[in-house]
From Swiss-Prot:
UniProt name for this protein: Small heat shock protein OV25-2
GO-annotated molecular function: unfolded protein binding
PANTHER family in the record: HEAT SHOCK PROTEIN 22-RELATED, HEAT SHOCK PROTEIN HSP-12.2-RELATED
Domain sHSP stretches: 38-149
Region Disordered: start-end pairs: 140-166
Glycosyltransferase recorded as keyword: no
Gene from which this protein is expressed: OV25-2
Family in the record: Belongs to the small heat shock protein (HSP20) family.
One GO CC term, this protein: nucleus
Keyword vocabulary terms for this entry: Stress response
Amino acid sequence: QTSPMERFIVNLLDSTFDDRSSRPLHSVAPYWLHQPELNECNIGNSLGEVINEKDKFAVRADVSHFHPKELSVSVRDRELVIEGHHEERTDPAGHGSIERHFIRKYVLPEEVQPDTIESHLSDKGVLTISANKTAIGTTASRNIPIRASPKEPEANQKSAINDAKQ
């Protein structure tokens, strides 16, 4: 399985070295491209996938390295905030410790209804946060009743009423 960056570099180098020499392509690739540590981190998916459709907004993120109690989802103004935090732990080999913390923020589109935001964590560790959207500028329509106001007195009646008050 190759990452998008690796495919880009391979395509770029293929077009540059179009003579198809016998020199292996990986020998000219950056050193970090084949390091297993980076592939294990799954960098591409950890950033999340945004789904912005006409009637729905959703975000999916791989948070499989975190327990549900180590995650939080909140909305601050028009910003969706996902946080995860591991407390410092000693690694199993006893050579050191590890602590992980991330904060990922997404600006919510104007048409997202904040009160419809829901989050679900799958058994595979994929966090999905979704919300309904409404069309911008549309409001619920309603009829406004026309009520009869009390009859106003005529001009000569107004002066008689004013004289009586004085």
